[in-house]
A protein has these predicted regions:
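Flexible, gly/pro- and Lys/Arg-enriched active-site loops
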Residues: 4-38, 43-195
Length: 195
């Protein structure tokens, strides 16, 4: 499984139940990675979607005890599954794990952490309040990370620059060597990062 996460430097993922910043480049990246794939989210994350409706061109697995699939029947262009966390954990038996993306919220990320092999992370330098966890502390295995160059974008409300970092964090396998991962990495706690 994969996860797509936007958080601040402290591992917080939102403010008052919503994503604090909507970055066009980050949303385009989200769309690119998840189109024609399976996304797993909780009910509260679904409520942050435009019109509280699952995205088109994806199979959306909603982890919920209070919703049922019939509520989404009118959206014929969207394949929606409503089920338990245990059923979400069973998805890799039926779908290639590289085609599954966990998209939130905090509780879903934490509960599915042992099953996640790769994290697509956007780190913003704006404070948030819904604590998720530091990636290297919540997952009990080593990772290596490849950072993408930050880019600058302006927050129109504040006219301040926002410089998020994009990273891909992947399970570190015992058979991998640092040389295979990247030539110029440095150890940062349990994460290996490209300089």
């Amino acid at each position: 499984m994969n996860a797509i996460i936007m958080c601040d430097e402290y591992g917080c993922i939102g403010i008052k139940g919503d994503q604090v910043i909507h970055l066009k480049k980050d949303l385009a990246r989200f769309k690119e990675y998840t189109t024609n794939k399976v996304v797993i989210c909780g009910r509260k994350t679904l409520e942050t979607f435009p019109k509280k409706v699952p995205f088109p061109n994806r199979t959306t697995f909603i982890v919920s005890h209070s919703l049922n699939k019939s509520e989404f029947a009118k959206y014929t262009d969207r394949n929606v599954i409503v089920g338990s966390l245990d059923e979400a954990i069973m998805l890799p038996r039926y779908v290639n794990t590289s085609d599954i993306f966990v998209i939130g919220g905090a509780s879903i990320y934490q509960q599915l952490a042992p099953f996640i092999d790769k994290v697509y992370l956007t780190v913003v330098h704006e404070p948030m309040d819904n604590y998720y966890a530091r990636i290297n502390q919540d997952y009990n295995f080593d990772y290596y990370s490849k950072s993408f160059a930050p880019f600058e974008i302006y927050d129109k409300a504040k006219d301040d620059p926002i410089n998020p970092n994009f990273e891909v964090i992947q399970k570190f396998k015992a058979t991998d060597t640092i040389k295979e991962l990247d030539q110029d990495v440095e150890v940062d706690f349990m994460i290996l990062r490209r300089k």
